[in-house]
Swiss-Prot record:
Lineage, top ranks: Bacteria, Bacillati, Bacillota, Bacilli, Lactobacillales
Protein name: tRNA pseudouridine synthase A
GO biological process, one term: tRNA pseudouridine synthesis
Calcium is among the record's keywords: no
Record note on quaternary structure: Homodimer.
Listed InterPro entries: PsdUridine_synth_cat_dom_sf, PsdUridine_synth_TruA, PsdUridine_synth_TruA_a/b_dom, PsdUridine_synth_TruA_C, TruA/RsuA/RluB/E/F_N
Length: 249
């Protein structure tokens, strides 16, 4: 068997998430169906580095799969790209070692979250940015977001019921920029891994801080007390993008 690593992007609006699930459309299943057709009906299993939720987009998701034969990477990329649905794009494909695993190989992820604070909202962006048409103090949020950098126990920012026991993660970058129009905000988070709904919960909290409904120091309190009830609401998924996955050499 020959193992391939692929970088893909997708519009998450019409998917129930990356991971295959019964009675719902998923990115994993669509790519597996295309690869199975290319493999003359023999089933191919796809593994993903990140399991994005329903409505979440990806600019640089990484997958791997095995084929029973070796094929030129560009020809394979072209075939997979052109035969996949329009809301999936295959950016690149490369041969990798047989023991490479896109999820378990050491890597870091970067996510971006886009907020549209325009009035009225732009209906063309409704699936690609979370609308928040309320007053926001950007400087307060920029101070608060830096408190998330470093190694912390992020229990207070994860969804209840998660099966992950170790909730300590390292965030190497947490930043917020505003575009030149002042309408769109982009939150960026890079780190060695993120808990279930962690980014959306952090953004929901930062928006509350920006709206003066929580103090800047609320971030410190949430990290100290590890209490989800102290954090803000979970931001909608439509503003979230898996931007990039970087593997260590």
């Amino acid at each position: 068997m020959t193992r391939y690593k692929a970088t893909i992007s997708y519009d998450g609006y019409a998917f129930a998430g990356f991971q295959r699930q019964p009675h719902a459309r998923s990115v994993q299943e669509e790519i597996e169906k295309t690869l199975t057709r290319l493999n003359k009906g023999q089933a191919i299993t796809v593994h993903g580095a990140g399991r994005t939720d329903s409505g979440v987009h990806a600019l640089g998701q990484v997958i791997h799969f095995d084929l029973p034969y070796q094929m030129d990477e560009e020809k394979l990329r072209f075939a997979l790209d052109t035969q996949s649905p329009e809301d999936i794009d295959v950016i690149s494909i490369e041969l990798v070692a047989d023991d490479f695993h896109c999820r378990y190989a050491k890597h870091s992820k970067t996510y971006e979250f886009t907020v549209d604070r325009g009035r009225p909202k732009n209906p063309m962006r409704r699936h690609y940015a979370t609308h928040f048409p309320y007053p926001l103090d950007v400087e307060r949020m920029q101070i608060a977001i830096k408190k998330l950098e470093g190694t912390h126990d992020f229990t207070g920012f994860t969804a209840s019921g998660t099966s992950v026991e170790d909730k300590v993660r390292t965030i190497t970058e947490a930043s917020l920029i505003v575009d030149e129009t002042g309408q769109f905000l982009t939150f960026t988070f890079s780190g060695n891994g993120f808990l279930y709904k962690q980014i959306r919960n952090m953004v929901g909290t930062l928006l509350k801080i920006g709206n003066n409904r929580m103090p800047v120091e609320q971030i410190d309190l949430i990290l100290e007390k590890k209490d989800r009830q102290l954090a803000g609401p979970t931001a909608a998924p439509n503003g979230l993008y898996l931007k990039e996955i970087r593997y260590e050499e």
